[in-house]
Amino acid sequence: MKSWTSRPVPELPGSMPQLRLYDTALGRVVDVERQPEQSMYVCGITPYDATHMGHAASYVAFDLLNRAWRDAGVRVSYVQNVTDIDDPLLERATATGVDWRELAQSQIDLFQTDMDALNVLAPNHYIGAVEAIPDIVPAIEQLIADGVAYRVAGSEGEPDGDVYYDVETAGKRSDATDAWTLGDVSGLGEKEMLELFAERGGDPTRAGKRHALDPLLWRVARDGEPSWPGSTLGDGRPGWHIECTVIAQKYLPAPFTVQGGGSDLVFPHHEMGAGHAYSLSGVPLARHYSHAGMVGLDGEKMSKSKGNLVLVSKLRAAGEEPAAIRLAILAHHYRSDWSWTDAEFAEAKDRLKQWRAALDHAPAGSAAALISAMRDELANDLNAPGAIAAVDHWAAEAIRSGSDKSEQDTALVTDAIDALLGVEL
């Protein structure tokens, strides 16, 4: 699947110091190992309501990581999927009377346009779940052959043959120190897992499962649902978690550096994906797990069901500048839960004007200290609010000085804010 095209990233003198990142699985901030190439997988959208502010905040967060690595002079291999076949997509297509393929493509196109507008660097590989099915089928067959997946008999009108992952058996297969067991990524207890599993697409009460938390690997064909050839699995379509695992294992090293996504993906999605990966390869999926906070609206949870989604495309259609939208997102630390408000968006627009005005008075020799301060903040768990505060201080001092601008420093500050924060002045 074709991705959008990234804009060029300015090169700056010097480089990013040692990057430290909060690792969800470890529960603390850790050094991200220095190496000549870093790799990242960020879970993509299910294309039926793009791009709301929660989506935007998550992809902007990991765009900061991408930019920090690039500023450190390393190559970055970045993969993102798109879940272009899933129950919510099919349900929305049925409700609106639109073919699911047309709905998915229209929302993918809109998402990519929004990402380009927000200056989010494009992934090296942008892979749809549907195009990955030929790779997913043999992976599931391997899990069955290895005894960590099983078929479930039909009941209550459901057909025979759905395939599930056996979390208990999989977790006992190896006593290696890096082997996966249930809870390694999320750190949750079984009670919390069961609640979240039911809320986030799982089926804990499905008859015939060995364990309530066993996730679906392959859903055999049903009347009225799209399906694909599954070889020995029979026609059907893949479960959500196995899609990302197989895509990541095909396009990234094992283990890759960072698995990213919203905090609502910690469990079950990233937990189960880690299990699938270890069962398939005997190697952890990722070295680090990083998650962005949730975004609400005026203090309320933002959700499709509540009809209170703030869409990037609607803001753009209303004439709002994407750089201001991005700056409003960056005013919050990526791990924090926060709410989008008109007042804070107004602050972001005012900040953007202030920064641009300050460029007319950029003091000679001021850029180097600003760039160093921005780098120090971003190297500390992607502290964008700290980097913004550094620019605010520089801008206030520049305007206060009233000096004639230094062309060199104006160019350096403009490039730094673009390269490190992704905000174009």
Swiss-Prot record:
Annotated residues for binding of L-cysteinyl-5'-AMP: C43, G44, I45, T46, S58, N81, V82, T83, W240, G262, S263, D264, V295
Cofactor descriptive note: Binds 1 zinc ion per subunit.
Annotated motif 'ERGGDP' region, positions: 199-204
Swiss-Prot/TrEMBL GO biological process terms: cysteinyl-tRNA aminoacylation; mycothiol biosynthetic process
Record-level Gene Ontology MF annotations: ATP binding; cysteine-glucosaminylinositol ligase activity; cysteine-tRNA ligase activity; zinc ion binding
Statement: the UniProt record of this protein carries the keyword ATP-binding: yes
Any one GO cellular component localisation term in the record: cytosol
Record-linked InterPro entries: Cys-tRNA/MSH_ligase (IPR024909), Mycothiol_ligase_MshC (IPR017812), Rossmann-like_a/b/a_fold (IPR014729), tRNA-synt_1_cat_dom (IPR032678)
UniProt cross-references to Pfam families, sorted A to Z: tRNA-synt_1e (PF01406)
Annotated catalysed reactions: 1D-myo-inositol 2-amino-2-deoxy-alpha-D-glucopyranoside + L-cysteine + ATP = 1D-myo-inositol 2-(L-cysteinylamino)-2-deoxy-alpha-D-glucopyranoside + AMP + diphosphate + H(+)
EC number in record: 6.3.1.13
UniProt short sequence motif 'KMSKS' region, positions renumbered to this chain: 301-305
KW Metal-binding (keyword) present: yes
Gene3D superfamilies per UniProt: Anticodon-binding domain of a subclass of class I aminoacyl-tRNA synthetases, HUPs
Signal peptide: none
Cofactor(s) needed for function: Zn(2+)
Keyword vocabulary terms for this entry: ATP-binding, Ligase, Metal-binding, Nucleotide-binding, Zinc
Function statement: Catalyzes the ATP-dependent condensation of GlcN-Ins and L-cysteine to form L-Cys-GlcN-Ins.
Oligomeric and partner information: Monomer.
Protein name: L-cysteine:1D-myo-inositol 2-amino-2-deoxy-alpha-D-glucopyranoside ligase
Organism: Paenarthrobacter aurescens (strain TC1)
